[in-house]
Amino acid sequence: MRRAMRVERKTEVRNGIKRGVFALFAIVVELIWVYIGLRNLTGEYSWIPFLIQGLAFVLVLGIYGRHINAAMKMPWILLIAGAPFLGVPLYLLMGFNGSTQRMRRRYEIIDEHLFPAMPQQGGILEELESVDYGIANQFRYLSDRLGYPVYRDTDICFYPTAEEAFEAQLEALKKAERFIFMEYHAIEEKTAFERLFEVLSERAAAGVEVRLFYDDIGSIWFIDHDFIRRMEEAGIEARVFNPMTPIFNAFLNHRDHRKITVIDGKVGFTGGYNLAEEYFNITHPYGHWFDTGIRLTGEAVRSLTGIFLENWNAIRGEKKDAEKLEEYLRLPSYCAAEPGYCQPYADSPLDGEQVGENVYMNLVNHAKRYVYFMTPYLIITDEMSQAFCLAAKRGVDVRIITPGIPDKKMVYQATRSYYNVLTRAGVRIYEYTPGFMHAKQCVADDELAACGTINLDFRSLYHHFENGVLFYRYRAIAKMKECFLGTFPQCREVTEQYLYGRTLFQRAEHCLLRLISPML
């Protein structure tokens, strides 16, 4: 078994740290100011406590009656009932925030142009229904409910390491002729990005349109405020998603966790890795970093292009750009080597649909022989937990690989708090002992798989912008299964001895963490 590598500390960009710390400090001060202000007003106006208590009662009833997951309700109900002077204003600020409503409207405007520009080709779903009606229903959910087409003429290549995926990505980028679109949660201006920047700047100089889109909080510690200017000087148009501000804004909770590269609308990459050192094991802050990726070639890349353009345009709210989507969304002429079915999809916290969770639950619920998952976090709803347990109880071989070395200790303990109920039902859980498991993928019954950015945790499933690819009957699925089978021997399987060995303090800690898990 491979030894865990020496833990190394990341190098952080100083001004990014200052900006992040200042913004967080300012937001905390604002919330404290609201709390103290309400408290002070109670001394002048005796009716204010009754108003707050009345609002607390109404809000608790309203939250309880909302058609959302029960785990999302409980923390708010306890906070509002237990500390109404804090919980009531905080919930009102979060729930009735104008910025979130404005962003939701922007996405609706973009989608009015986006989805008509990439319609479902006729006959594909009907053909899939004749092959396997149950499988077709899983694809039909994403197609009929959300508008993401199913494609045939697409080849898929699976990369069992982020290093292999990145090298293939660099080679493909060097061949770009029309445009390059890249969207990532985290960028670090070090060795890996320098290699990428060299290719991007060279293609930009050759007349290729290059766009780079990144999440501000995901990258805030690793790039400085001059990053966009430097990109523009090299001919690269860069935009930042949802910048961190010192003013309280509920939309700040929603981050862009997507990882997409599109080249000329013909080749696309996605997977778990960002553009930072640890993802390619250049540094080792958490032992060996395990990540994977996939390459799409052919028609399905159109949907990856559309997913990128949705965020790119919505963040600026530029309607004129939305009307030009068609020129980037033409189907490429491509004849695939494999007769599989491929469906890229995205998840948004603004549409009220838990797409990532529903795709995973469909995979688990329809598995007949086995279903395997890799995820860095395992913080799930009761519904997802029950799906895993029921599958195991009906004889499906359910296995989940989680990290052996955590990147966030509290989240790691929250992950472990779910082990007991799952393993008792027959789910087999493995911890990747050499380091941090960051891959987000699933394979079932040798024929169906999903790979992308979506973790098995509340933040990915409910709060972030995510993307993935669902695919059926590809050789890449066998490669993905080999990846699982090669990883299990490197893991420590969670056993009953481990579960019953928990101390009373650990049990209490796990109960508390499960209660607040929707906020982690």
Located regions from the model:
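N-terminal localization/anchoring segments of enzymes in phospholipid and broader phosphate metabolism
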Residues: 1-358, 362, 366, 406, ...
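Glycine- and other small-residue-rich loops at beta-strand/loop junctions that grip anionic moieties
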Residues: 185, 376-377, 411
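Helical hairpin unit composed of two closely spaced alpha helices linked by a short loop
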Residues: 367, 377-398, 403, 408
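Thr-Gly-centered strand-to-loop micro-motif
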Residues: 374-375, 402, 432, 451-452
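Short, solvent-exposed amphipathic alpha-helical segments in soluble enzyme
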Residues: 387-391, 417, 485-486
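CN hydrolase (nitrilase-like) catalytic-core segments centered on the catalytic cysteine
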Residues: 414, 426
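Catalytic-core elements of nucleic-acid end-processing and repair enzymes
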Residues: 440
